[in-house]
Amino acid sequence: MAATTNAGRSMASWRRLPTLIAAFTLSWASSFVAAAGSADYFVHDLPGAPDGPLVKMHAGHIEVNPENNGNLFFWHFQNKHIANKQRTVIWLNGGPGCSSEDGALMEIGPYRLKDENTLVYNDGAWNEFANVLFVDNPVGTGFSYVDTNAYIHELTEMASNFITFLERWFALFPEYEHDDLYIAGESYAGQYIPYIAQAIIERNKNAGPVNHKWNLAGLLIGNGWISPKEQYEAYLQFAYEKGIVKKGTDLATRLENPTALCQLKITESPDKIDYTECEEILQDMLQQTAGGVGASGKPQCYNMYDVRLKDDYPSCGMAWPPDLKSVTPYLRKKEVIKALNINENKSTGWTECNGQVGLNFHPKTKPSITLLPDILSSGVPILLFSGAEDLICNHLGTEALISNMEWNGGKGFELTPGTWATRRDWTFEGEPAGFWQQARNLTYVLFYNSSHMAPFDYPRRTRDMLDRFMGVDISSIGGQPTDSRLDGEKLPETTVGGAAGNSTSNQAAEKAKLEMAKWEAYRKSGELVLVIVIVAAAIWGWFVWKDRRKTAGQGYMGVATGERHSISTNPSGSRQGNVSGRTRGQGLEGFRNKRSGRRDVEAQDFDESELDDLHLSKPEDPHADSRYSIGDASDDEDGQKPEKSSSSGQAGRS
């Protein structure tokens, strides 16, 4: 009897073995898949890329708001060289609602478009000594998407989403989590960046063994919308300085009245970011200074992003810069959408600026100028830079907000009471480039002959600025250093236009990453999982054979059972819905919340199963009436993009 009982137990144990092996195999394979999830975002090729090695890059979506299907799109480029330390620069464009692919393909990315089919190398790209991470922020911008009834309204909400994004991005790419982290951008990103920085500082206070601190090393804001009080007033001051409006004329009087009303409204409610009365100043100025007839037969107005240029009224710069005519069709190509890991069947297509994001953005939070003193005092350096020919976020407004701001025991750029830091003349390769001014952790750089998008005009100069701000040490790199001087004094050497050699640390890192890429390829093809299953089946078969031989020797027969062990998954249905509605320009919507005209309105959504490496589970919502929005455009007459920003859809730019 004892023999029978023991044999029965032994047989039962072997029958349970397939389930145990399957569970172990699935668990092990799942852990491996999670660890290698970054392979799903790898960009294997980029249509139109120039001959030569492709810059290593990853792109795709990360879910930040499962309740409303909010996903942020990122495009990450690996650094070409590692200097004295690892660095990552996050780049954000503004709007709100303007895509950071502006920055990727027209400003600081490794490639620019020669035409809509051809990429060329960008001499001065920011990924020379830093990894660069472009993010379409907030949800609904560019390739990012969200339910159309769930656009965000607040800067704090935007910052919270961004922290979630970073946590999941670093989980996918843990090799970058200990990098020195810089956040850079322009225009309305002057509101985004300080709020994100504040959220990181608060997160770091509660960091522990699991969620350890991020090394926030600095902020860079170009032509930023930061302080309404000084920057609205600077519209007319800039117009006087540039001769757009002459003092004492009837036109000057007509513009001085709304400027005075604007300042009154700001005095009454000083903690707002946008004021309707103030937005009318720029609109009126562009309209009343328009004159002459261009080749199109339309009146000519000043380009608000570069007053050296003229444009058809009422566009006034919204079709600028000229590269934009190639960027839009390029990012809508099916092969590009596939390469960047976008679901091509369910995307409305990329648009530079989504007017719906701006129209739904109604921040009640204070302007970001109120955050800068605490950020500076926390030890995070800030660099503000301006293109001298930009009107919409002009340098006079930036210089005024610095002069009025108090931080680290002083006001403005004063070194001691009554003594201010000097403006140091900057020459770059023998040409006047601008000036630098610095005090108490804040640096200001003015770029001569430059627009709202300084990196578009001078990629090599802005890269030189970045490298100096980051403290790049090229001693281990080599290469031809640029001649960059302040007041004639040669600055520490940085290379511009590519380093000749590479550091040992970078070579070792590359070798390790190539090895990891092989394992990712195995995982992606399923070969590893297949091997595991075959081995597990062989082991189980051997144990069954051995057991049957043993029981046969004891006078018992193995009995086949009808049990089946299976592990199944229930696929979730995709969520669908229509993107409806159009944006109407009001006030400066037609100027700053641009990019309108005809928009794609077919039903769109995203298959979440393709993006679930780090996604949270979300409840089914089969009755949602208006689902994912990705790059909806506003419907201004010229089909152009928004700018600086505004809760009323009136501002910002890229």
Swiss-Prot record:
Gene3D superfamilies: alpha/beta hydrolase
Transmembrane segments: 525-545
Purpose: Protease with a carboxypeptidase B-like function involved in the C-terminal processing of the lysine and arginine residues from protein precursors. Promotes cell fusion and is involved in the programmed cell death.
Protein name: Pheromone-processing carboxypeptidase KEX1
Gene Ontology biological process terms, A to Z: apoptotic process; proteolysis
Skewed-composition ranges (Basic and acidic residues): 612-626
Lumenal face of the membrane: 30-524
GO molecular function: serine-type carboxypeptidase activity
Source organism superkingdom: Eukaryota
Membrane topology designation: Single-pass type I membrane protein
GO cellular component: membrane; trans-Golgi network
Subcellular location: Golgi apparatus, trans-Golgi network membrane
